[in-house]
């Protein structure tokens, strides 16, 4: 029995590839593996903000979250996308249970204080209503796993006073993988892994070390949203998870293949 945390980017929730992923998940769950999904919703949130005439402000790949932006995230991520994702899973025989930070306090968080961020200069950055993960309701997740349900967790945390906080989905997935001591954290993105040239899918890097990551940030090869994604992913290797794999859109059977044959698909992070 393996424990797998799967992170889905918001752009995949309504993509045809999700049905392929869902069928692979059914195989994994039927094999008595424990699977949890964490999903974001950045593209949909940005689209709704544009429709509403609200500015989308990003700092070093992170979304600045004021009160209006948080309401958008609640509506899009914890609402529409979580429901739609659970529905697509159900249609493919997977029993997903939609959750967010306030659901049984499954994602326990506190508001992040200003801090210096890689790629954002030397001054501390205040990201607004953004949270840092403190922990998870592991007994609740354990009960769901035991009954072969798949927790589907929106990337919103909640503090002890009930205040919802926006949290980067990769952060939630990475820290959940560490807390569960997962056999694999799989990040499914719109690109086939970490690329030397973002315009060339064939430039996929099969394996990347932390030292190589630092060099690529310094020379600009890795930038934007990939920086926090990889930072959190490297950190999870020190917190209990056994492996991290970043993959693109998957074909039938590719999910298990990516986990069981590291480097055959996507990019595997090594210490």
From Swiss-Prot:
Coiled coil feature spans: none
Q: Write out the GO MF terms.
A: acetylglutamate kinase activity; ATP binding
Locate the site labelled Transition state stabilizer. Answer: 7, 229
User: Any idea where this protein resides?
Assistant: Cytoplasm
What's this chain's function?
Answer: Catalyzes the ATP-dependent phosphorylation of N-acetyl-L-glutamate.
Q: Which family does it belong to?
A: Belongs to the acetylglutamate kinase family. ArgB subfamily.
**Per its record, how is this protein called by name?**
Acetylglutamate kinase
In the UniProt record, the gene name given for this protein reads argB
